[in-house]
């Protein structure tokens, strides 16, 4: 019904559960992925925490995620997709690169309480000097309504301090699950009829980043940790999370 629409799947663990529940559905997903109607993104096993996790755990996220995609879909993924993680440590660019990926997408940093993050398209440089092409969708949400109001908010935010206006609009019901529905897609179809707004093109994440690659020499460089000012005290007030995470890491070793 909507041949232009592409659905994104970002976590192999979800695919494992789908296959356990319905192998028929899993085979349909594989077929749709070949057709370009579904796009696998992320290159990691789940959308993981980067602050408490040790370096071995981070590396294994990439190892097992990419291994799963290669074995089940025949190829690796070229981007790390972490829309809702509470901050990103400064060694992550190096780990992303060693995981076979060249691109990074997050949304959460736009939730800073006091200091607005200054870039949407930028080069993230890790503490060792590794650089990753990165994108922060300017609407600042993974629950976009794909409405004229959504697009105007996106336009206003990116025009404040950007010279490269390419951006993702990630629409659907992202927090709590469900994804896009027909209403969202119908809005996207109609939104280009509004002459006062920038044009929207249905596509996929890899195509978007490949377009940004051509402009990366124009992008600013941000060095070090991507610190999230929101959700302060998450790890301090719930210290048992850190304790049990470390216990599990020791058991894995």
Question: Which residue stretches match the model-derived regions?
Answer:
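Catalytic-domain carbohydrate-binding cleft regions of carbohydrate-active enzymes
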Residues: 1-253
């Amino acid at each position: 019904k909507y041949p232009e629409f592409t659905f994104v799947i970002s976590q192999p663990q979800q695919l494992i559960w789908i296959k356990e529940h319905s192998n028929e559905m899993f085979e349909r997903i594989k077929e749709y992925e070949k057709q370009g109607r579904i796009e696998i993104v992320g290159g990691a096993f789940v959308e993981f925490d980067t602050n408490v996790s040790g370096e071995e755990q981070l590396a294994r996220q990439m190892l097992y995620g990419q291994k799963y995609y290669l074995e089940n879909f025949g190829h690796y993924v070229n981007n790390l997709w972490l829309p809702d993680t509470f901050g990103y440590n400064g060694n992550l660019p190096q780990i992303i690169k060693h995981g076979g990926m060249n691109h990074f997408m997050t949304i959460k940093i736009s939730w800073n309480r006091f200091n607005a993050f200054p870039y949407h398209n930028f080069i993230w440089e890790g503490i060792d000097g590794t650089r990753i092409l990165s994108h922060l969708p300017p609407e600042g949400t993974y629950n976009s309504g794909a409405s004229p109001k959504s697009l105007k908010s996106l336009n206003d935010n990116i025009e404040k301090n950007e010279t490269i206006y390419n951006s993702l609009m990630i629409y659907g019901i992202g927090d709590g699950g469900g994804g896009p529905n027909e209403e969202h897609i119908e809005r996207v179809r109609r939104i280009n009829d509004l002459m006062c707004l920038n044009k929207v093109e249905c596509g996929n994440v890899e195509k978007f980043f490949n377009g940004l690659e051509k402009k990366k020499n124009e992008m600013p460089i941000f060095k070090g940790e991507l610190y999230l000012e929101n959700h302060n005290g998450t790890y301090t007030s719930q210290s048992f999370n850190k304790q049990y995470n470390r216990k599990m890491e020791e058991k894995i070793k």
